[in-house]
């Protein structure tokens, strides 16, 4: 008799977290617009599904309104021609956002809204990591998106691994779970099932020092930590191919004091 292979369900990349947005964003379009994205995102290999997953918006002309603490006047901070990147806490509540210039002509590539909390208090995409066993720690939002794309393509990792971002190469906070900071967020994730952390920060020589000290702090929370390296100095996950990211993921080395020492001497070679 003829056996029929079961029809493969097509898996769609989508977040299951209900988002709340008390933060008023500058005037914007939700993405995608009629299935399309600004060229800037297309060039960075961001698909419409990814743009939706990360709740990206497009501000053509818009201002962030804030009260100047010195004059008590309401002012407007211009976010024209920027991709708005909302930042959520672990409960999916929007706390702040970033605006990434897409023209290449702006004085500042990233703009941060005045009078809102610093993004460095939060783990970017942390709300999608709640309940996952493993997180990949990246620096910037586009690094997180690059890793998400790679992991989503890898069926064995898809449901268990989530990338998160620290907005730079240091972790905020101390060992207090109630505090609104990054280490507190790691403790909360641990309480919700997080077991493994893979560090995928930039691999320049100075950067490895920062990576190791962050790895040490996370390991001290009782979490398994591995250190990954993309293999090329200065390459970050936002610019790497999915193959490079997965290779780095599988090749990551468990953090030990010895590895930290070796990295001080040999730099990136210690991680390859």
What spans do the regions from the language model cover?
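Phosphate-handling DNA/RNA-contact segment within nucleic-acid enzymes
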Residues: 62-193
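TOPRIM metal-binding catalytic domain and adjacent DNA-binding surface shared by DnaG-type primases
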Residues: 2-84, 88-91, 127-130, 219, ...
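A short acidic (Asp/Glu
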Residues: 146-150, 175-176, 208-212, 238-240
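A residue-level signal for conserved active-site and pocket-lining positions in enzyme catalytic cores
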Residues: 41, 92, 199, 237
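Short, aromatic/basic amphipathic alpha-helical patches
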Residues: 209-221
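A generic structural motif
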Residues: 166-168, 224-234
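Short, surface-exposed amphipathic charged segments that create phosphate/polyanion-binding patches used
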Residues: 177-187, 236-251
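Acidic beta-strand-to-loop metal/phosphate-binding motif
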Residues: 137, 194-206, 229
